[in-house]
Amino acid sequence: MGQARDRVNYSFKRLKEIPEELRPREKLLKLGPENLSDEELLAVILGSGSKGADVLSLSKELIKMGWEELEKKSVEELLKVRGLGLVKALQVKALVELSKRFKGGKSRISIRNPQEAFEFLKDKFDERRESLIALYLDLSNRLLDWEVVAIGNVNTVFSKPKDILFKAVKLSANGIIIAHNHPQGEPSPSNEDLNFTERLKKACELLGFELLDHLILSEGRYFSFREEGVL
């Protein structure tokens, strides 16, 4: 048996103990984000620790809590974490919220007028058949979610108000925009379109939602019920 060797410690507890080239920012620059641990990525975002806690120790403590727990905690509760001051608590809450908004690829974009609704919707339809899409917005007209509510044939699509309102209740939405396409023909409303819109508007009012608009899209153009004074 050879001479006993000093034990090699791969786990550095404090940032200042880590060789400069292996610190989170330097690693990110040299190796890319995919080669950093969760703690290291959070340390890059937080930037520095405090007198009471090194940034890596602080990041490790926060990651250990888990994303769902961080989402639930208020700023006041986060301030109880050793070394986490007000600015960093706000950074954590902002990061969690931003991550939630981008989860699933659905960023919280704003839709404030018919043109913005059209720009969002124009590539969402199958040109071969009619479809009905619903957009669900919050009080600030930010998109909470959207879905294809119904798919029909080349000339018609059938739906009921409850098909749209069920998800609005689930999301606690404030406003709803519906849209459907006319694969063949002009983007102008039929009698069926007018009747359905009126029924949906009344159903929305009963449940405390606002029907913001109904758009009909066809061949790169649109008809807005709100813009034309029909709604």
Swiss-Prot record:
Binding site for Zn(2+): 180, 182, 193
Motif (JAMM motif): 180-193
GO terms, molecular function: metal ion binding; metallopeptidase activity
CDD domains: MPN_DUF2466
Keyword set, alphabetical order: Hydrolase, Metal-binding, Metalloprotease, Protease, Zinc
GO process terms (BP): proteolysis
Domain spans labelled MPN: 110-231
Stated family: Belongs to the UPF0758 family.
Protein name, per record: UPF0758 protein aq_1610
